[in-house]
């Protein structure tokens, strides 16, 4: 794709969606009538989703994600507390975003002060346990207790510890399972992108994607699409700063992203230094004229 061209941001095809099983809904008896516009028909008492709508929505949502990062410098939070958690966490990390995949704790969005305190506690425990001198005098039992607390906090808050504030966009894989996350985001007026299966209410989210929300292949494809949109936005942002993300060595997008950010910081630092030197030189010339 050419820089800053998002007209063809998502190139996913109906064939790819079919291969991932995204067209399979739930049993007809479990359907939500609000999903009727997105249902193609039934097969063996299972609803089949009309993938024309899915492709169209994926294109729209890819652009929403792209703009959220590039134009708003936003923070995107991926949510999936089911068995797919490792896939979701991996893709979120690879594109430099955030995730909750262990358990959604009530107040994660509506009580950010308490969440921040928990994250600070996690940071303190990690620093303490990493320094042998700081745990001198503690019994083995006390150290084990601190380790368990650290592990519990990491499971709950590790994916959002560096978020630096509430997310500006939520991506939810199953709005029925993670309904509390949806409820809190709506209360906080945080836009929601979500997969809506045939048993879901599409009216609960801002950007619904009709599709299977259970199959591992489906979740992997969704995450790849979302992650690609984020990475493209970051690539264009870095390109505007003179950094070519594609030219940085490494197979892992996350590592390349970190390297690119480091280069950007160095460039900005040099730019600030150059400005300061020029200012000092101008001041010196002015002082010489005054003499």
Swiss-Prot record:
Classification via Pfam families: Ribosomal_S2
Top-level taxonomic group: Bacteria
Keywords: Ribonucleoprotein, Ribosomal protein
GO cellular component: a single term: small ribosomal subunit
Plastid listed as a keyword: no
Gene3D superfamilies, per the entry: Glucose-6-phosphate isomerase like protein, domain 1, Helix hairpin bin
GO aspect biological process, one term: translation
GO MF annotation terms: structural constituent of ribosome
InterPro entries per UniProt: Ribosomal_uS2, Ribosomal_uS2_bac/mit/plastid, Ribosomal_uS2_CS, Ribosomal_uS2_flav_dom_sf
Family of this protein: Belongs to the universal ribosomal protein uS2 family.
PANTHER family to which the protein is assigned, alphabetical: 30S RIBOSOMAL PROTEIN S2 PROKARYOTIC AND ORGANELLAR, SMALL RIBOSOMAL SUBUNIT PROTEIN US2M
Protein name as catalogued: Small ribosomal subunit protein uS2
Organism per entry: Orientia tsutsugamushi (strain Boryong)
Organism ancestry: Bacteria, Pseudomonadati, Pseudomonadota, Alphaproteobacteria, Rickettsiales
